[in-house]
Amino acid sequence: RIYQKMGDWNEPNAMRWMIAVTASWSLPQIFAFTIYSRDMFSYYGQGMVMAHGLNPYKHGVSEISNFMQNGADPMWAESPPPYGPVSLKLEEWIVRLAGENIDLSLFYFRLLSVFAVIGILFYVAKLAQAHGFNQVRALWQIGPNPLFIASFIASGHNDSLMTMFMLGGLYYAKRYRDTWWGGPLGVTFVALGVAVKPLALVVLPFVGLLWAGKNASWPRKFIFWVLSGVLLLAEMALMGWATGLEFGWIKALSTTGGQYIWYTPFGLVIGAASLFVQGDAFEVIRKLIETVGKGI
């Protein structure tokens, strides 16, 4: 029915309908209880750790009074967060702004996610236009997507902020690839994404290619890949110094690899192994499967 209202992708009303649908489906989620994830409660706990002058890479949320009642998942209570310095600093600022009130903090985390979602939609539209694709059609795959809304607004995941910076880096590197500053600007956005969640690093090679320019030779591509890596490393060092967290996020990358969830592919394999092997032999097999999973 909504598609019928939109009509052709190129009609003037199509964009208005796309925005209206996305907004109407997203707005209630801003005020709803968090669903599908307890990550925002962990963000609050990490913000509390920061607000009390502790390094979250060395001190888990379990050191904060009443952390269990505040909703943080006990699975990660003593684990360093797999997030970068920008994410942790934003968590601290939000907790301080909310006066350490958990309900208000969660609402502010939601607002930050809404800001990031708007940024994602903006950059998707710009990238679609830059590559000759219909903006409305590109946005339709993302904006009104229930999984997108549930993960980035209802659950308030910081992946939304990371994704916004990743897309911003690609867009500015593409948009200003003929200038001397387009590539560095793209790398800076990727660095901000990495400083939220290190997974953003996967787009750095593509930003390096855009910085190298059209029809670049392989030696030139490698040179700009190296330049991109050096610039990102320098910017990460600067952000680590400014926040006092340095490169603690590198060691924390193994945090999620130390646990497994039963319904994930490797969790299912480990669960199946537990049906046939017990005791020390099972621990050996479990560690082997976890090592393979980390490698992949």
Predicted regions and their residues:
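Primarily membrane-embedded glycan-assembly and transfer machineries that use lipid-linked glycans
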Residues: R1-I19, F31-S37, V49-W140, P146-S155, ...
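Short helix- or helix-capping micro-motifs
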Residues: T22, A138-P144, V190, V194
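N-terminal hydrophobic segments of proteins, predominantly signal-anchor/transmembrane helices
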Residues: A23-F31
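Catalytic and binding regions of secreted/periplasmic enzymes and modules that target cell-wall glycans
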Residues: Q46
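Short helix/loop segment immediately N-terminal to the Walker
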Residues: L104, Y108, T179-L185
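Membrane-interface alpha helices of multi-pass inner-membrane proteins
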Residues: I149-F152, G169-Y172, W181-G208
